[in-house]
């Protein structure tokens, strides 16, 4: 099954008349991962569902299919819509479990585990501070199963918070969303002014296509085909042994989507072994504002290209524009010289990016009255 990414906001810091702040949905074979949920997220989510119903018959984004909410960091343009959305799902009597994940600092983890106040050095935008505040504002009264897990990504150290007490217990590792058997969610450390990480959804390698032509040549029955397709060997009545591996091509390579969140260009932890099929990377500033990008640990479009090369991405999509960037085309124009063969697209609100099993990427551009598809040839 393909990975279908819905980008519901491409503005940075605050909404504009044409752009909302961050919030994306990544739909894969196991369910939906929500990456960030800025101001007004639940309204934008509901509108996208209505768009699908009207313009993409048969495609859905059911809230009951959301298994995980993962924050890239704690700045409010990435988090401020989360608690209202969670409370709305509770009012709608949600029963499905939800995993909530986010990065924090070692100092915050230590304080939570020791049941002591957070140190002054822990910034207001740290997710540890926010979550404790959310618990006091009703987050501790949600009635559906929910796990609150914070981690020091660089140290791979994770704790689960108790919303009733504010305490926590250490975990052996970062948990995966419940029911995910065909995909994995992974944090990728980034470089920002508060604890941060990107999130990568990777679909596992899948079996190659079933060789129908060979099955036709052998005159196999429907039952025999089904057995071989399931990986079961068959002993035929004439004594012939048919091995399932003879009817499958080689495994298809895993495909993946990495959403960076806010970050400076080329985080030190990024390595080309990560190799996402698609990187969705922030592009907050214009090239002329490089000093400002460095100061606030953000990126330009050209910086995003450098990040894509550092992490071994096959395709790059830009998002998270400052209000000085009136058109996403501006970002693309500024980075066209340095892209040098890397497939790139500039996103707008409500666009979709579909990563197929074989690694092709389609940019579905929202026009206001449906989506138009642009095929992107991966750089592989």
Where do the language-model regions lie?
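Binuclear metal-dependent hydrolase catalytic cores
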Residues: 1-258, 266, 271, 326-380
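Active-site flanking residues adjacent to catalytic metal/cofactor-binding acidic residues
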Residues: 35, 72, 261, 281-282, ...
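Conserved acidic residues
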Residues: 67, 277, 314
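Mobile, glycine- and charge-enriched loop segments
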Residues: 263-297
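Conserved active-site loop/cleft motifs that coordinate metal ions or position small ligands
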Residues: 278-281, 316-320, 343-348
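Active-site-proximal loop/turn and secondary-structure-junction residues that shape catalytic pockets
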Residues: 285, 322-323, 350
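Glycine-rich S-adenosyl-L-methionine
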Residues: 295-311
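A conserved acidic, glycine/proline-rich C-terminal tail/linker
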Residues: 318, 322-328
């Amino acid at each position: 099954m393909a990975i279908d990414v819905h980008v519901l906001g491409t503005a940075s810091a605050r909404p504009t008349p044409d752009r909302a702040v961050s919030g994306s949905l990544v739909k894969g074979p196991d369910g939906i991962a929500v990456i960030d949920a800025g101001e007004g997220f639940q309204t934008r989510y509901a509108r996208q569902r209505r768009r699908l119903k009207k313009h993409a018959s048969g495609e859905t984004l059911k809230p009951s299919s959301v298994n995980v909410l993962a924050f890239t960091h704690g700045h409010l343009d990435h988090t401020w819509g989360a608690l209202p959305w969670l409370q709305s799902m509770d009012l709608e009597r949600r029963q499905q479990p939800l995993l909530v994940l986010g990065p924090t600092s070692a100092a915050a983890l230590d304080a939570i585990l020791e049941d002591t106040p957070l140190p002054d050095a822990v910034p207001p935008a740290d997710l540890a501070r926010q979550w404790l505040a959310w618990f006091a504002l009703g987050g501790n009264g949600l009635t559906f199963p929910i796990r609150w897990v914070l981690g020091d990504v660089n140290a791979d150290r994770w704790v689960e918070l108790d919303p009733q007490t504010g305490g926590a217990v250490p975990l052996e590792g970062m948990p995966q969303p419940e029911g995910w058997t065909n995909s994995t969610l992974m944090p990728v450390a980034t470089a920002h002014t508060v604890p941060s990480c990107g999130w990568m959804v990777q679909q596992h390698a899948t079996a190659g296509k079933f060789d129908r032509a060979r099955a036709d040549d052998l005159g196999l029955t429907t039952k025999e085909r089904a057995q071989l397709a399931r990986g079961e060997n068959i002993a035929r009545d004439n004594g012939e042994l048919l091995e399932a591996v003879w009817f499958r091509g080689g495994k298809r390579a895993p495909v993946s989507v990495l959403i960076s969140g806010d970050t400076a260009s080329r985080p030190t932890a990024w390595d080309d072994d990560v190799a996402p099929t698609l990187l969705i990377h922030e592009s907050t500033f214009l090239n002329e504002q490089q000093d400002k990008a460095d100061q606030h640990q953000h990126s330009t479009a050209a910086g995003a290209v450098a990040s894509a090369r550092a992490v071994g991405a096959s395709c790059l999509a830009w998002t998270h524009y400052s209000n000085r960037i009136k058109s996403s085309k501006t970002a693309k124009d500024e980075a066209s010289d340095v892209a040098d063969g890397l497939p790139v697209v500039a996103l707008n609100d409500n666009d979709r990016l579909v990563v197929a099993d074989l690694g092709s990427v389609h940019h579905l551009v929202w026009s206001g009255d449906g989506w138009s598809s642009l095929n992107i040839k991966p750089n592989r």
